[in-house]
């Protein structure tokens, strides 16, 4: 099998340039990486990544004041497909709070049953949570909600059966429950999610979803069972999403919810695909503007405003500018309050490039 490559610069993608050569099997698209395909279409390889530079200023009654300018995320990924087999390897080069140097995704996937049933083995996102399963490069707010950060398990090693139809998705898997991506299966988790979109057009979407996770632990007090309910909708330039979370942790019940709304001021619609929203794609050379508002209440991880894991409330307002498909500039203000009365605030600015 013969694969032909044409050299190209990643900066072309950053500038919003789209190039394609069907005869050579090479494609460079803004915000979508570089794809190589074999002449007979049986094999493909793609490389891409993201870089997020953040400035954030936090003022908390608990942790005081802090100002930081650092790399929020710097990732590169490689993914490919040959016949009925696919893989993805995504590496975290740098990340605030963790330092980077780890594998975000590292899995092998069998696709021979078609889109309705696929098997993925390796480190991957567990199927839980609308906002969690929306990529960090696509979420409307600069940071996920405090509720998602606390309840959603994120990435772990495991085996998942998942699939999708025209307006529905499902996922069910067994994962290691250590929460650090290790290969120790001493503690396991069973996690699942289903979604259904009774309305799904280019300009109108109604999404319903639900998920659960049951996580074993070495100590009974650390056993966790959680579920969530999802609701999302879009109508032209307006979009909204909400989630309710409930967990029993060693006999202690905690819960919370968030609701978020956005308005694309320049008229574009936020795309919806496979049970999640995608980022705004500007329809003109002037770019697209988006305003975002979120409110959350309950037990969650309010670390962005310096309040830690606690019962609290938080309001977020933000504005995003998308000059092209690859670049995003964002500004947000978060105001949080613990149930006990302590306050925390954060101003965050971000420059993001996806290649």
What are these regions (language model features)?
Residues 1-20:
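Gram-negative bacterial Sec-dependent N-terminal signal peptides
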Residues 22-27, 59-63, 134, 212, ...:
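Outer-membrane beta-barrel pore domains
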Residues 25, 29-214, 254, 258-283, ...:
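Outer membrane beta-barrel
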Residues 6-8, 108, 247, 300:
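Short amphipathic alpha-helical "recognition" segments used for binding
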């Amino acid at each position: 099998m013969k694969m032909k490559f044409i050299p190209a610069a990643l900066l072309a993608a950053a500038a919003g340039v789209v190039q394609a050569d069907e005869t050579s099997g090479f494609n460079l698209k803004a915000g979508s990486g570089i794809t190589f395909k074999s002449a007979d279409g049986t094999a493909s390889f793609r490389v891409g990544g993201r870089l997020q530079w953040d400035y954030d200023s936090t003022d908390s009654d608990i942790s005081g004041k802090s100002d930081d300018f650092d790399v929020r995320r710097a990732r590169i990924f490689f993914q490919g497909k040959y016949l009925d087999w696919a893989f993805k390897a995504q590496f975290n080069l740098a990340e605030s709070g963790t330092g980077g140097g780890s594998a975000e995704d590292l899995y092998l996937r069998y696709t021979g049953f078609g889109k309705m049933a696929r098997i993925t083995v390796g480190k991957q996102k567990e199927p839980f949570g609308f906002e969690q399963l929306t990529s960090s490069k696509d979420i409307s707010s600069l940071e996920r909600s405090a509720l998602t950060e606390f309840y959603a398990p994120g990435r772990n090693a495991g085996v998942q059966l998942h699939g999708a139809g025209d307006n529905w998705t499902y996922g069910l898997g067994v994962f290691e429950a250590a929460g650090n991506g290790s290969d120790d299966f001493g503690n396991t988790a069973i996690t699942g999610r289903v979604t259904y979109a009774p309305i799904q057009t280019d300009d109108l979407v109604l999404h319903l979803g639900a998920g659960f996770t049951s996580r074993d632990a070495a100590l009974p007090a650390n056993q966790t069972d959680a579920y969530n309910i999802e609701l999302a909708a879009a109508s032209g330039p307006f979009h909204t999403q909400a989630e309710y979370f409930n967990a029993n942790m060693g006999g202690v019940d905690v819960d919370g919810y968030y609701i978020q709304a956005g308005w694309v001021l320049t008229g574009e619609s936020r795309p919806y695909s496979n049970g999640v929203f995608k980022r705004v794609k500007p329809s003109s050379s002037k770019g697209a503007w988006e305003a975002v508002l979120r409110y959350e209440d309950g037990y969650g991880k309010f670390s962005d405003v310096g309040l830690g894991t606690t019962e609290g409330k938080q309001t977020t307002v933000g504005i995003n500018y998308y000059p092209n498909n690859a670049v995003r500039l964002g500004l947000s203000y978060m105001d949080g309050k613990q149930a006990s009365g302590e306050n925390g605030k954060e101003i965050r600015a971000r420059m993001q490039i996806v290649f």
